[in-house]
């Protein structure tokens, strides 16, 4: 996956997760994005589904896990770069 494609995917995940203010923490781990959200109700499951995730996102309290495939670590890193203004 090209750098620009990773960036666009990361931006789409940020939007689907309720925006940058809703993401407290996120990381990529092998095939999953794992994170903590300020308000899980802001997650747009329909938007996540359009991002070709595997199955449904798993919401547990304020935590979320999303199976995204082998690019999870790249996407997670890029989400964090965007959240830090890079």
What do these predicted regions represent?
Residues 3-86:
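Membrane-embedded alpha-helical signal segments
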């Amino acid at each position: 996956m090209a750098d620009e494609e990773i960036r666009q995917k990361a931006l789409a995940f940020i939007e689907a997760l309720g925006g940058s203010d809703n993401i407290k923490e996120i990381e990529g781990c092998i095939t999953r994005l794992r994170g903590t959200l300020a308000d899980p109700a802001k997650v747009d499951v329909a938007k996540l589904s359009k991002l070709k995730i595997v199955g449904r996102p798993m919401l547990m309290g304020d935590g979320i896990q999303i199976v995204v495939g082998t690019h999870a670590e790249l996407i997670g890193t890029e989400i964090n770069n965007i959240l830090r203004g890079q």
